[in-house]
Amino acid sequence: MPELPEVETIRRSLSQHILERRIEEILIRWPGAVEGYEEKTFADAVRGLKFQSIERRGKYLLFTLEEGWSFIAHMRMTGRMVYHAQSQEPEKHTHVVLKLSSGEIHFTDTRKFGRLQLVRTEERLQQPSLARLGPEPLEEGFSAAELGRRLAPRKLAIKAALLDQTLVAGIGNIYADEALFRAGIAPERCANSLTKEEIEKLYPAICQVLEEGIAANGTSFRDYQDANGERGDFQKELKVYGRGGEPCKECGHTLVRIRLAGRSTVFCPCCQV
């Protein structure tokens, strides 16, 4: 699933191409990919409108259109939004095509979990998907103290807490594993057992892995590509994620893979306590 760095990379790459471009036609090839309005109403509402801005909130993209309309896009497991300068034949799993005044956006999703939701702009932050999100980890209002305050009542594993989007928005399996490794914290530790010193290590570790992920244009294993169809490079920098059974790059001990909060989790039992 695209996490904060991947979604931010998609936002930046789309912004290069579509701002002030007009939606001339929308082709909905699978109606289940769109939400908010019936298929024809959805298409009629946005036809002729320009993209004014693209923002990110957690793992969601928020597209502001003219006349008070917005798209909320969530890629979920395998969703992709790719810009094509010239008209392209849709792939098998391309569910929505936005034909613009210059170029096209193809919304493609092999597993059919991703969605494009049409909402009134003034109502979008009240949508349940966005209203429940925690703070953005890379914004000024978030700090080690705020992270500690939010972890204090959490009686669950710290890895599970980091995956909870109401705690902090945008962190998923990849960056949770990497942040915990950098902070030297075992993923099974109870969230409310972390000391002030440990939280002061975890907070910058979260920020660093997310910032480095963005700088590397995200992590690509299978499906993820940016809006230009290019893969990310952060998979080359991963210390633990996806490396269960391999030696730790810091101490040489064998990395352990467990199942935690329903997700595969990899950590070093020597470096993380």
Swiss-Prot record:
Its cofactor is Zn(2+). Pfam families: Fapy_DNA_glyco (PF01149), H2TH (PF06831), zf-FPG_IleRS (PF06827). DNA binds at residues 93, 111, 154. The active site is at 2 (schiff-base intermediate with dna), 3 (proton donor), 59 (proton donor), 263 (proton donor). Keywords: DNA damage, DNA repair, DNA-binding, Glycosidase, Hydrolase, Lyase, Metal-binding, Multifunctional enzyme, Zinc, Zinc-finger. It catalyses: Hydrolysis of DNA containing ring-opened 7-methylguanine residues, releasing 2,6-diamino-4-hydroxy-5-(N-methyl)formamidopyrimidine; 2'-deoxyribonucleotide-(2'-deoxyribose 5'-phosphate)-2'-deoxyribonucleotide-DNA = a 3'-end 2'-deoxyribonucleotide-(2,3-dehydro-2,3-deoxyribose 5'-phosphate)-DNA + a 5'-end 5'-phospho-2'-deoxyribonucleoside-DNA + H(+). Its EC number is 3.2.2.23, 4.2.99.18. GO terms for biological process: base-excision repair. The keyword Zinc-finger applies. NCBIfam families: fpg (TIGR00577), PRK01103.1 (NF002211). Monomer. This is Formamidopyrimidine-DNA glycosylase. It comes from Desulfitobacterium hafniense (strain Y51).
